[in-house]
Amino acid sequence: MPLMSQARSLGKYFLLLDNMLVVLGFFVVFPLISIRFVDQLGWAALLVGIALGLRQFIQQGLGIFGGAIADRFGAKPMIITGMLLRASGFVFMAIADEPWLLWLSCALSGLGGTLFDPPRTALVIKLIRPQERGRFYSLLMMQDSAGAVIGALLGSWLLQYDFEVVCWVGAVIFVLVAGLNAWLLPAYRISTVRTPIKEGLMRVIRDRRFLMYVLTLTGYYMLAVQVLLMLPIMVNEIAGTPSAVKWMYAIEAVLSLTLLYPIARWSEKRFRLEQRLMVGLFIMSVSMFPIGMTTELRPLLMLISLFYMGSIIAEPARETLSASLADSRARGSYMGFSRLGLALGGAIGYSGGGWLFDTGHALNQPELPWFMLGTIGFLTLAALYWQFNQRRIEPAMLGGH
């Protein structure tokens, strides 16, 4: 086997192992935050939404700087430092008994993600051939779903002992991942040239096509982040037990493991990337409207299943399209900036969603936040349609590869 092909093959397997552990460590802790602080301790959903939004905004909003630094110094030191920072965030979360401590823990967790997420994403572009990326992103999403279920199951089981134990287990997992990267990850350069930090940043900022695409996705992410805030709260409220949240993630895992890869293989040969993204977002948006009027667990889980189906269709296309638009001379910077939509959407989706949830309950209108989210989804869909039709992306980039 040629040396480069061998490096790609080994790198692919390491990326899969690394991703599985990162997802596991994240989902041991984060799905239980809203249950712990809102349902068990009685905090306002807005306070917890601010904490989750802060983590999202720091991790994704500052990602361009993490990516630019990785372009300059390489992936390995950034990834290791980021993993250790996230572990420290979980340690602070274990002792959080006031909102400011929860906010600090989420900020540290987000800062860690700022450092490790863009170089890890750029390594996928470096090591996976363009024609294989769509399917590889589907494999990563399948891993995400399986890891989410295993993590949520483990976290729910540990929660019966104490939330501190949940946080410490999450911290240990990220320390383990840092050790594996220190031991096994080669000192890869993620860009084709050693790009100065400022040049990488400016290259992205001048790319108006990429900027518009990233910012338009803010509305998409406002819907997507509710799997960590309002959906777990709804499941817990209707079922009456935190352990029911695991069924939500089990549904995601079953759908992803059985349908995600076949749908990606089938659709990439028949539809352009932007078509797949918009169809998925349409399904996600439609599923939002009835959730607030649901009073039984089975219909709620059916609507959540519909939401996940939309995500399964949209997410591989979104990730592949972002990678296709990245300039190879500044991959880290591009992948860092591509998270800005997630930063804005996450911050608004978490804090705004928490506020709408509290307001809806205070006004005895529990359907209010879900109606607003569905409306935002359709507005985003209209903006994407306008963008893809008024400012055409090159056909080569919109193919399935």
Curated annotation (Swiss-Prot):
PROSITE patterns: MFS. Keywords: Cell inner membrane, Cell membrane, Membrane, Transmembrane, Transmembrane helix, Transport. It is found in: Cell inner membrane. Gene3D superfamilies: MFS general substrate transporter like domains (1.20.1250.20). The keyword Oxidoreductase does not apply. It is a multi-pass membrane protein. One of its GO terms (molecular function) is transmembrane transporter activity. GO terms for cellular component: plasma membrane. The keyword Zinc-finger does not apply. The chain crosses the membrane at residues 13-33, 34-54, 99-116, 139-159, 165-185, 214-234, 244-264, 277-297, 300-322, 340-360, 368-388. Its main location: membrane. This is Multidrug resistance protein MdtH. The lineage of its organism: Bacteria, Pseudomonadati, Pseudomonadota, Gammaproteobacteria, Enterobacterales. The gene is mdtH.
